[in-house]
Structures are given as C-alpha cells and as structure tokens.
C-alpha cells in the first residue's frame, strides 16, 4: 500500500509549503522487484488537467522532441526547457544518472516522455523516475522551487538483517551514505557520487554496502548537501535494518544496496565500519615499544638507504657513459614517437616563434621568472593582452626533450581548474617551447618557505590550496580520460593564481596507466627527494599511492611552513615526517603549526589536516587512502579518520641530551602563547633525480 507524508527542507523551511513523500510497499510477485518507472501524477497541489490535442499537449509534444537530446548531449546529462506561453507553457527537467552513457540517457528520457502521458492522462504536472533517469514537466515554473518532492522506495528483495545486528548495520549504512553525499556535493561538474563500504568477513548481517547520491548539477554544494541531508534523515524511519532502499527527488536522490547496482568502479571506497575504535596506546607503552624496537627500526632504514645510494651511484655512472656515446642527432624531438591522435591534439595549439619573441621581448633577461630542469621560464604578453608563462628548452642542452614531449602530449589532453592550462606550443627553428597561462603568485614554495611572503598565506588560503591540489590529483587519478601518475608532485610544481587557487604543473615525469593498471616499476628513478614514496625511492615501484604520499608531504609542509628534508640518507637524523609524528604522539603537534598564520587559527581543522597528511605518508601503499577518500575526509565532518601508524622514513627520536635532538636550535619550537613571529626554514629539498627515457 502507499502512504503520503510531508517534509520541509531545513534551509528553505519558511518558503516551502510542504513536501510529499510516497512509500512504495505494494505487494509484488515473489522474487520480483517493483519495476520502474515510479510515477507521481500531480505531485504538487493540483494544477489541473489539459485538454486533449489542446495547446498544452502541443507544447508538451514539442518539448518531447528536444529534451532527450539536450539532456544526453550535456556534459552533466542534465537539461531544462520551456515551450509556449502562459497559461499553456510547459516547463521540463530531465536528469540522467551519473553512470549512464549518452545513448542510454537519451533513450531513457524519451521513454519517460512517452510513458508519462499514458500513466497520468491529461495531467499537467507529472514526475517520473526510471532507474537511469528522471523527468518532470509542469505548467508551473518549478525550477527555482525551494521545496522538494521525494518518493521513498524499497525493493522487494531487500531483506531485514537480524535484530541484534540492525543497529550496527544502520550505522554502517549511515556512514557510507553520508560520505557518498559529501562526495556528490563536492563534485563540481556532476554533483554525483558512488561509494562502497567493506563488509565484515564471516558476518552475513554485515555485507559489503554500495551507495549512490546525486543532485541536479545546477545546485551549489551547500544546497546539494542540504537536500541530501534532509532525505538521508529519513533513513532511520523508513529503512531501519533493511539491506536496501533509497529516495528519488526532483533535486536530489540517493540509494543504497548490498549488491552493485551502478556501473563502473565506486568513486569512494571505505573500510568496514567499526563501532568502537580501539583505544590509543598509553604513553608508557609507546615509550617502551620505542626503546625495544629502536635498533631494528634504524637498521631497517639505514641498510636499504645505503643500498639505494650505492645503486644510484652505479646508475649515474652508467648513464654518464651512455650519454657520452650518444650522437647529437640522436637526441632530437622527432626521435620520440608521437601518435596521430597526439599530433591532432597538439595541432590546434601551435604558436609561431615571432609571436613568442614579441611577447617576451625576444626572451629578455628582465622577463625571466624561473628556471626548470630543462631551461628558462619567461613572462610574456600575447597581442590580445593575455599574460603567459613561456617554458623554453635550452638549445645547448639535450636534457629534457623527452620531458617536454611527455608534458606537451599530456597537458594538451587534460582540462581541470586545478591543472595549469596549456595555451600553445612552438617547435620552429630548433626551438622547443611550451606556453602556459601565467600564474601571478608564482609557485607555492616561493611563498610558503619565505619568512616574509608566507604571511600572505592565512589558513583560509592554505586550506584552499590543500583542497585544490587534492581535487586536481583526483582528476588525474580517476576522473580524466587518462589515468595519470604525476610522479613529481612538490611545492615548486604547485602554481598559484591571483587568488591563490592552486594548479598542478610540470608533467614531464608523468606516466599513463592503462585499463585496470594500478602500479608499475622502473629502474630509472625520477623525482625529488623529500616527496618520493619509499617504495618508489628504494625499489622503483610507483602507483597512484606514490602521488598520495607526495600529497601528504605537501599537506604537512603547508601547515607547518617547513620543508621536508627527506630521510633517504642514513646520516639524516630527522625529517619533517618524523618531527610531526613525534609531536603527534606526544599530543603537542600544535607547536609545529606555522606561526605566520596569526594568533587564532582553526586548530581543530588543522589537526584534521595533519591527521590526513600522516595517513597519506604511511609506509605501506595499501595503508594510504585514495585521493578520492582524501577529498571526502577534507570536506566531511561525518567520516571517521582511520587510525595512524608511524609514517615512512621515521627514525626513532634521540634522547633529550643528544646534540642532534630534533627539538634543538635546528628545529626551534614556535612559542605556543600567541605564536612566535620567527619562522625557521630547514635545509632545502631541491635535489631532483631525473633519468630521461624515450616514451
């Protein structure tokens, strides 16, 4: 049977008149689901009927010819439209599920427009929900309505878990659904998210759970999350103990099941929900364990480090001999194969050399703003007034041609607001030049590690930078047409625009993964000490989790204002990761917060970011979160952060009397009261290792 209930949006309660909810529990044939579509005829206070073959029906038929194609051709698979004039004007809206392809989307919307008049004959206001799409048309302008119409449904095969397990299962569902809602609200392009939460092995009442959440993409993150929060709030009442259910609405919807019901890999993956986290180790126990394991820990770090250094010395010698034998003509740009697709993507970006010479005053020294691993970077202005950054490969040096080609092909295919944008390329007269949008605030390291400039970075800007880097990295790892590992994520490769929004740059060392590939190995290590993941620095194994490690280092650098010196050298007594970890375990990590941010920073939010940073630099790649999970952690207050273990490359602390104490003058503590105005920058991690290989 069906029943109706009203509910109000928390934000727009004053404006909304009421909300209609329908619980579908109609008996079905054994073993069958209630088949879509779910249809509501006249969901709002009755708006009347239209006349057969009248003006309203003509307008509705016209809408039916355009709305399916408009929806499927939209990047977000969402469209609205109007036809005719009041009082016979038709307002229409269609949204396809985020995992639907364009053809399936178009078919679904077309079917909904055919079915709706048959199921609700001559009704002016109709709401239809299919599995892959939803449709509403009305004689009312509902596009700016503050209220939501929601239908709640459960599938017949949805069962109830045992009474004893219901509370734990409901809690697990709530964690996943809320995290997925956070993801959807944060998705700037589609407002769509899917999630998966691991089950508990051997417990039939705690299976793996899948969830999907979506809003119409025209909603802001705040409105989307408010809508989802409101409908998710019905979980305890409607779905307690049930293994599946969901709600459809005009502006937002969610669903969860214990089986995969959406296409593709979940965008969010969570570990099994644990009701009671294990208690933290006592200080005395931690101290005892440190003493017991000190020798083993030091040996575990020192021996691989020595072996790695010896291997790198041998590798450098071999490379030197190989380069010495190489003839100049062998090292040309054309020696690096370029596919026809690559050429097609590059062709539209070609700039002529005279234009670039004029833009940079013929590469004047006064226009030089930096130096990369392959040459100089100049500031320029195109004839239309656009400011540009020009990266010019040194003609006298053959180093970097492979990097240039790799970067050109990759960046030409990528577009995201947190990736630096490629404007053009010039390959005339033996010049190899890339032209990028100009970033007025330079690179992050220039601002962050300068004792004067870092005062420009208050916590709001730093948190925006952390979020932006994470979103850009997620695009590279999961959301772009290519699956890319950057391999050289560091502060100097994060550029800042006029309002300090970050953009990831320098894709010369990036690698593309195909299909389901998640990791690879190389005997040519390339990157920057201090940011390399241990498995990459020591064994050449790299994956998306290598980038996550680099991101974690960046987070800790941004919060503390200190460079990570790295600890691949066994003679290095301490690095930033160790410093943060020791303070974290002692409960005084707040002392490491960069004092240049002022007197009253949001400590709780900073501690959360430090926790996330430490999660990202765990020694084992499997212990690090995916970057999509990091984005959820950053944007959500409902996700419980996993517990921490000692990060990679941490060396046991020395005694307080030791002259190499990490809290000596080399690493002075900021004064806790009011924070000190003095900021100490430790030794630079500017050592990069690059071995260029034709790709």
From Swiss-Prot:
Glycans are attached at residues 49, 53, 70, 101, 178. Residues 1-31 form the signal peptide. The chain crosses the membrane at residues 295-315. One of its GO terms (cellular component) is plasma membrane. Residues 316-695 are cytoplasmic. ATP binds at residues 369-377, 391. Induction: Induced by benzothiadiazole (BTH). One of its GO terms (biological process) is signal transduction. Its main location: membrane. GO terms for molecular function: ATP binding; protein kinase activity; protein serine/threonine kinase activity. Residues 32-294 are extracellular. Disulfide bonds join 96-105, 108-133, 215-224, 227-252. Residues 38-142, 151-261 form the Gnk2-homologous domain. Residues 363-634 form the Protein kinase domain. PANTHER family: CYSTEINE-RICH RECEPTOR-LIKE PROTEIN KINASE 6, RECEPTOR-LIKE SERINE/THREONINE-PROTEIN KINASE SD1-8. This is Cysteine-rich receptor-like protein kinase 6.
């Amino acid at each position: 049977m069906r029943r109706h209930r009203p509910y109000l949006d928390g934000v727009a309660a004053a404006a909304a008149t009421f909300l209609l909810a329908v619980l579908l529990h109609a008996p079905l044939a054994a073993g069958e689901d209630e088949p879509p579509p779910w249809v509501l005829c006249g969901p709002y206070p009755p708006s009347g009927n239209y006349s057969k073959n009248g003006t309203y029906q003509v307008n509705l038929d016209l809408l039916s010819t355009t709305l399916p194609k408009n929806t499927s051709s939209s990047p977000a698979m969402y469209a609205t439209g109007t036809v005719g004039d009041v009082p016979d004007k038709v307002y229409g809206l269609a949204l396809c599920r985020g995992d639907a392809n364009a053809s399936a989307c178009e078919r679904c919307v077309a079917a909904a427009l055919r079915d709706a008049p048959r199921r609700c004959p001559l009704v002016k206001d109709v709401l239809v929900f299919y599995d892959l799409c939803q449709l509403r048309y009305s004689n009312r302008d509902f596009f700016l309505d503050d209220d939501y119409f929601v239908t709640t449904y459960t599938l017949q095969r949805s069962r109830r878990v045992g009474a004893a397990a219901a509370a734990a299962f409901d809690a697990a569902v709530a964690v996943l659904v809320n995290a997925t809602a956070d993801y959807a609200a944060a998705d700037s392009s589609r407002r769509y998210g899917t999630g998966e939460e691991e089950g508990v092995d051997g417990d039939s009442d705690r299976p793996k759970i899948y969830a999907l959440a979506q809003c119409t993409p025209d909603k802001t993150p705040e409105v989307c999350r408010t809508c989802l929060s409101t409908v998710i709030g019905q979980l305890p009442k409607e779905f307690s103990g049930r293994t599946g259910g969901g709600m459809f609405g005009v502006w937002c919807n969610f669903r969860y099941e214990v089986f995969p019901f959406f296409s593709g890999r979940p965008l969010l993956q969570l570990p099994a929900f644990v009701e009671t986290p294990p208690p933290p180790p006592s200080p005395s126990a931690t101290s005892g364990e440190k003493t017991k394991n000190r020798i083993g820990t030091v040996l575990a770090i020192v021996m691989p480090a020595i072996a790695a250094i010896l291997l790198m010395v041998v590798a450098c010698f071999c490379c030197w001999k190989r380069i010495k034998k190489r003839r100049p003509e062998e090292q040309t740009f054309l020696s690096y194969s370029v596919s026809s697709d690559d050429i097609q993507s590059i062709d539209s970006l070609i700039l002529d050399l005279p234009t670039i010479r004029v833009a940079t005053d013929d590469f004047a020294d006064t226009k030089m703003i930096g130096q990369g691993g392959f040459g100089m970077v100049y500031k320029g202005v195109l004839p239309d007034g656009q400011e540009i950054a020009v990266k010019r490969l040194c003609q006298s040096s053959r180093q970097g041609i492979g990097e240039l080609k790799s970067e050109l092909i990759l960046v030409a295919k990528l577009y995201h607001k947190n990736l630096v944008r490629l404007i053009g390329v010039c390959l005339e007269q033996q010049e190899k030049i890339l032209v990028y949008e100009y970033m007025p605030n330079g690179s992050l390291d220039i601002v962050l590690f300068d004792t004067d400039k870092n005062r420009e970075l208050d916590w709001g800007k730093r948190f925006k930078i952390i979020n932006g880097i994470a979103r850009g990295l997620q695009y590279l790892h999961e959301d772009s047409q290519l699956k890319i590992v950057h391999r050289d994520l560091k502060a100097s490769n994060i550029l800042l625009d006029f309002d300090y929004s970050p953009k990831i740059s320098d894709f010369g060392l990036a690698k593309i993964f195909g299909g389901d590939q998640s990791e690879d190995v190389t005997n040519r290590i390339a990157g920057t000490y201090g940011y390399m993941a241990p498995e990459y620095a020591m064994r050449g194994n790299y994956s998306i989790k290598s980038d996550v490690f680099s991101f974690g280092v960046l987070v800790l650098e941004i919060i503390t204002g200190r460079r990570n010196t790295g600890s691949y050298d066994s003679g290095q007594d301490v690095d930033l990761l160790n410093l943060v970890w020791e303070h974290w375990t002692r409960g005084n990590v707040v002392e490491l917060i960069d004092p240049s941010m002022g007197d009253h920073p949001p400590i709780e939010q900073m501690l959360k970011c430090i926790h996330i940073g430490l999660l990202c630099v765990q020694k084992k790649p499997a212990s690090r979160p995916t970057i999509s999970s990091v984005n959820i952690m950053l944007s959500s207050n409902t996700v419980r952060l996993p517990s921490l273990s000692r990060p990679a490359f941490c060396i046991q602390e020395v005694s307080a009397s030791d002259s190499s104490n990490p809290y000596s003058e080399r690493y002075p503590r900021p004064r806790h009261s009011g924070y000190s105005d003095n900021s100490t920058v430790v030794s630079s991690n500017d050592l990069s290792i690059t071995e260029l290989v034709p790709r």
